[in-house]
Amino acid sequence: MGDRVRLTGDLTGRTDTLARIVAVDDRSTVLRRSLEDVADTRGEKAIVANADVMCIVVALADPPARTGMIDRCLVAAYEAGLEPILCLTKSDLADLEELLAAYEPFGLSCVVTRFDEPASIKELRRLLQGRFKNNNGK
């Protein structure tokens, strides 16, 4: 997902028309995952190309936040050249200070959302506006 391509043919999208890919542009970023059972010698599969940001969505409660998952996502984001954004949900159900303090040294953009505060989503929208995103989380 995310490859930029050049097409030829009928690009109207009407039924019974044909178009084809004639070129695939170079990727500016690539998020990959490793595969142990793939024939490719690199053992990797591209998940998304040309993304700008990775939004790491984490519930603070029900279930509790898993810092290992956050850490793995951060490593993948930095490796792929993506800007990580940490989005914490269910902040009305748990204390978030300890988690925020743990990731403060990374200088991450962090958004805290609450179901009873619709305005808390505005900052997340602002950070993601006009950008190609990859969302990860539980």
List PLM regions with ranges.
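Short amphipathic alpha-helical segments
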Residues: 67-70, 98-100
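Conserved beta-strand/loop subsegment of P-loop NTPase cores
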Residues: 50-58, 79-91, 107-114
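Histidine-anchored nucleotide/phosphate-binding helix
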Residues: 68-78
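N-terminal accessory targeting/assembly segments
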Residues: 1-67
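Residue-level signature of catalytic and energy-coupling elements of molecular machines
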Residues: 2, 77, 128
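A generic structural signal for short, solvent-exposed coil/turn residues
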Residues: 13, 85, 102-105
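Canonical P-loop GTPase G-domain recognition
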Residues: 90-138
